Amino acid sequence: MVRFLRPSSTSRDVLGLVHGTAGQATLIQQYDNMLKNFLHMPMAHPVIIICDNDDGIVSLSKKVRSKFDKIVSKTTTDSFYHLCLNLYMVKVPEGDPPAATDIESLFDPELLTKVLDGKTFNPKKDHEDQTEYGKVVFAKAVIKANAETVDFSGFEDLLTRVEDVIRHYAKHSAVPSSSTVTP
C-alpha cells in the first residue's frame, strides 16, 4: 500500500515541506540529522520523494551530490536514488530521449488545457492570479474533482519506479526476526 503525506501546518513546520523543490531540498539535506533525535526508529517503510524532472531538479541535484555524492540530473535515468536510511528520491520519468518533464506531463494533454473560471493552467505558477491557475488548483479542481474519469495510464512508468523502491527497501532493510535466527 502506498500512502501520500497530506500537506498540513505540521508537515510545513516540522519537515519544511513548502514551495515544492525548495522544501524537498531542505528535507534531503536534513533528513538523517532530524532522525538522530529519535531513540526508536522502526523504519518499516521507505520514504519516497517524487520530484519533477525539470529546472527544479538542479537544486535537488546539488544537495544530493554534496550530501550523498550521487549524481542526479535531467538526463540521468536511474529508476530511483537511494539517499540514506529509508530515504529515496524518484524522478518523473525522463522520456526518450531524456527531456525535462513534470508530473503533470503524465496526464492526457487535453486535461492541461482545462479552463477554470476563465483561467488557464500554468504549471510554473505557485498561486492563482486573474488569468492563470497553478498546480495546487489543477490537482484539486481538475484531477481530484474528476478522478473517476481521469486517465492515469501515463503514470505507469512512475509507479514502476515507486515499486522498485519498495522492493529495494524490503530487500535491503530486512532484519532477521528471532524466529529465523539460528544459534
Question: What is the predicted role of each segment?
Answer:
Residues 1-65:
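Conserved helicase/translocase motor-coupling segment
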